[in-house]
């Protein structure tokens, strides 16, 4: 079974995405406009 990881904004803690496996993700928060990175 694959685990689901939640991606939250580092500034305002808004839930941005729920992902299974990801190598690299860059996403901009629609609320506070901060660009978030994850590996």
Swiss-Prot record:
It holds the Pfam family Zn_ribbon_Com. It comes from the Bacteria. Belongs to the com family. This is Mu-like prophage FluMu protein com. It comes from Haemophilus influenzae (strain ATCC 51907 / DSM 11121 / KW20 / Rd). The lineage of its organism: Bacteria, Pseudomonadati, Pseudomonadota, Gammaproteobacteria, Pasteurellales.
